[in-house]
Amino acid sequence: ESVQAGNANHDPATDATSTWWLNVSATNRWKAFDGGLSDPVTQAGDVSYVLSFSKTADCVALFGLNAETVRVEITDPVEGVIHDQTYPLISSEEVHDGWTYCFAEFTYSTDLVVRDLPFYSGTELEITVHSTGPTEVGEILIGVDHYIGKTLVDTSIGLQDYSVKERDAWGAMQIVERGFTRTVDYRFSFATEDAQRIQRIMSRIRARVAVFSGGDGAAQ
């Protein structure tokens, strides 16, 4: 955002003292990489990104989705397309018997973690988030997947709600809806010989945005 008139030929990237420019937020297209979920990309129709890699990675995580499918395509400059898969986001979590199979409302997962992907230097990654209506993408994270242990049965989940509920002087309930945070407290077991490796991983990500996933299935 420009902070004063006559702002011509001033590069925001070199304005370290915010004399001409104020960093307000990422533009709509790049909100998927701003490190937060509160302000998603919003667009009618598909949201697509094409990213080039100079390092090795093997995992893509997408959060805050309002979409129907996610397509992940990886292209090698010599071999061509080496991975192309579409991941449906429709969820069966609400279906647990014959009645809910017939009458439960369709729901879609808002998060997706894709592992075992062949990223390496020179490859190109294309991510397409598809919806027939309005599409939202909260955040996209790309990195290396590290196994740190097996989750245990007493892992707990929670919800931190920042909404306000209070009564006014006449007793009427006033509700102000705000954002919320989903929380999880993972308990997991790991081999003793893995302790130092896990500690090194935690040290590297201690001041960075990171994804912790319980995985799919009871053994993850």
Across the structure, where does each feature detected by a protein language model lie?
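Short strand-edge motifs at loop-to-beta-strand transitions and within beta-strands
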Residues: V47-Y49
